[in-house]
Amino acid sequence: MPMSQPAAPPVLTVRYEGSERTFAAGHDVVVGRDLRADVRVAHPLISRAHLLLRFDQGRWVAIDNGSLNGLYLNNRRVPVVDIYDAQRVHIGNPDGPALDFEVGRHRGSAGRPPQTTSIRLPNLSAGAWPTDGPPQTGTLGSGQLQQLPPATTRIPAAPPSGPQPRYPTGGQQLWPPSGPQRAPQIYRPPTAAPPPAGARGGTEAGNLATSMMKILRPGRLTGELPPGAVRIGRANDNDIVIPEVLASRHHATLVPTPGGTEIRDNRSINGTFVNGARVDAALLHDGDVVTIGNIDLVFADGTLARREENLLETRVGGLDVRGVTWTIDGDKTLLDGISLTARPGMLTAVIGPSGAGKSTLARLVAGYTHPTDGTVTFEGHNVHAEYASLRSRIGMVPQDDVVHGQLTVKHALMYAAELRLPPDTTKDDRTQVVARVLEELEMSKHIDTRVDKLSGGQRKRASVALELLTGPSLLILDEPTSGLDPALDRQVMTMLRQLADAGRVVLVVTHSLTYLDVCDQVLLLAPGGKTAFCGPPTQIGPVMGTTNWADIFSTVADDPDAAKARYLARTGPTPPPPPVEQPAELGDPAHTSLFRQFSTIARRQLRLIVSDRGYFVFLALLPFIMGALSMSVPGDVGFGFPNPMGDAPNEPGQILVLLNVGAVFMGTALTIRDLIGERAIFRREQAVGLSTTAYLIAKVCVYTVLAVVQSAIVTVIVLVGKGGPTQGAVALSKPDLELFVDVAVTCVASAMLGLALSAIAKSNEQIMPLLVVAVMSQLVFSGGMIPVTGRVPLDQMSWVTPARWGFAASAATVDLIKLVPGPLTPKDSHWHHTASAWWFDMAMLVALSVIYVGFVRWKIRLKAC
């Protein structure tokens, strides 16, 4: 009789606000506000590691992890709760966030904190894949989760004695637990059976929004790969799986060769970097740092392992600004020997009077400009020498909102996710990332709200959400509270505090001084970029002698050199700045294919037009209005021969003038406000990978279609009301079709002119004057109302306007010279009723369109810093 197998421990399913996670026994489950928690509860009453769930002595228990606001059962605060099926507990207060438990019935995959192990690359001479064995478990370092009693210890009814586990403060990472002397390790949970296909979605263990790195169980090699090759990527069929939003599904391959281990990039979108340089293939040597997305892996002794954030050379993953000086024009110093250290979890405010270089420092730290002296390092990398590999780790939120106001929060973030995430991410992946980002920012309830209907603080959160899509670990904000009232100011600063508490380095440039107490440190700059103070906000009063900011700013502004001297006297002389490394090429931002970007921008542009109801109604009515105006021309012959002695001797010419001016006005009005209206948005998207070419082509195509539709409406109205051309077509088969082409191409060329004017404009206030000048000048240069042929310089100036060639093409189509002979019609060779004249007019319209688009492409190009 076969022996019965012991029953497997029951799994635990945790439900919170509609989300569901399932965990297997054997590992503590962390519930808290921290982004790295297994069950994240984004609530101000919840501690970073609030609650521990553990399977012990045949049952699941919930343990209060020394939280400030406690664990509640039946309205009573308790230290420990025995969990049973269908039980509910509250955390934070008796009416706080509710957790519902289900024990033993869920069949999906089980999430858990990962264990640690190294992956040793197989020896090429072996020629075979190594046999699977039990994963090696890394040792626990001090100050980490090992302080909790082991899982085999019975949980007492009273609060557990001794120190309880907490997430480390500062720069320590939640997992893997590590000590300063331990070799770098790679994360991999124990092998588990794959879940059913239908159960995968609800139990995903990784937090894509914060780019937590977990290496999952090894899979089998597929495809034709050399013996011993190791595949790296986001998909579960890789040997090393990185659930990192910037990693491609099959990102890179490690291949043993006679010369050593080689890493080969699999044409990934965001690239593979070795020691900060992007490579297609490279031989690895001990100590080489391989960067994939936001993850650093170290190659040592034939082993690929994650780089430890707490090693000395990596500066605990923080930001180090050392002796940074920036001088322009040879002798004008904007930043003067600034030094600053910010660890993960720290919120740093940069303040100072106008002209102190606050925004300049932010741009320099973000890598947009490089220092004259000194260095900026982040997570062990020189920002300016290795910028290409760090670009995705740095999120920059400019002062202007970078979210389209006409879109809902969901649509804005989904389009941004399409542009920023690798092309092999599915819609479900992007939806999950967006949902988690909004949850972190407490914006989930506003997901279907139009951005322009949000409050100022909520709009700033939406701008921050765009940056969090790719999981940056350094977030820089320039004047996020500008123009906000005190209540919204507090909301924004509280949000920044929470973002820092999640383990990021947050640097905020601000003029608002009311809520600096939420910051960990304050950097006060004097004019000329000189440091006047750097330290906790509680020390400002004792050090500066007053807490009156007006007096402080006045003092440092009156004598910046003295302010810096007093600072150095307090802190001691700063060490000499390290030598400046040669700035590397910025490299092209990682971007998806042109077609994918084109598709995304085109779909977004259409939604923007339709969502702006007032603008959309105006565009829809405009062709009907212009068509009706054309009907106001007196006479009843249309494009026939008018009576020279009648009331309308130039009826055909007047109809063409109104058609031509209507086409010019429709096209220019269609696009003139487009580029200036989203310039800040485009600049940020361009910096993170949006192709200027794809962006411009998408807009050209969308507006071309709209211009053609508008032209069709106008032309049909005129043809119905006045009749079609009577002299036959000169180039196309039908004169009515040819007249439509005349109007449509003129409208399209005018739309391209509108884009050019929008690229030139400095502000939205300049749009209306530019539109008026453009339309009125082309009314003159068309030649239909005021003769320009042979008149210097009107004739020459008219050659660069669409109206000149649009009117000439339509005049050639209807044979205006024949219909209205004599002094009313100038002898213009471009109006002749011949195919050569018509094709020349069309060619000029197309050429002008290309010139306008080329100018716009040059104007909005990505400029090197």
UniProtKB/Swiss-Prot annotation:
Its EC number is 7.-.-.-. Keywords: ATP-binding, Cell membrane, Membrane, Nucleotide-binding, Phosphoprotein, Repeat, Translocase, Transmembrane, Transmembrane helix, Transport. It is a multi-pass membrane protein. The chain crosses the membrane at residues 614-634, 652-672, 700-720, 740-760, 767-787, 836-856. InterPro entries: AAA+_ATPase, ABC2_TM, ABC_transporter-like_ATP-bd, ABC_transporter-like_CS, ABCG_transporters, FHA_dom, P-loop_NTPase, SMAD_FHA_dom_sf. This is ABC transporter ATP-binding/permease protein Rv1747. GO terms for cellular component: cytosol; membrane; peptidoglycan-based cell wall; plasma membrane. One of its GO terms (molecular function) is ATP binding. Involved in the translocation of an unknown substrate across the membrane. Transmembrane domains (TMD) form a pore in the membrane and the ATP-binding domain (NBD) is responsible for energy generation. Required for virulence. Disruption phenotype: Disruption results in a growth defect in macrophage and mouse infections. Function is positively regulated by phosphorylation.
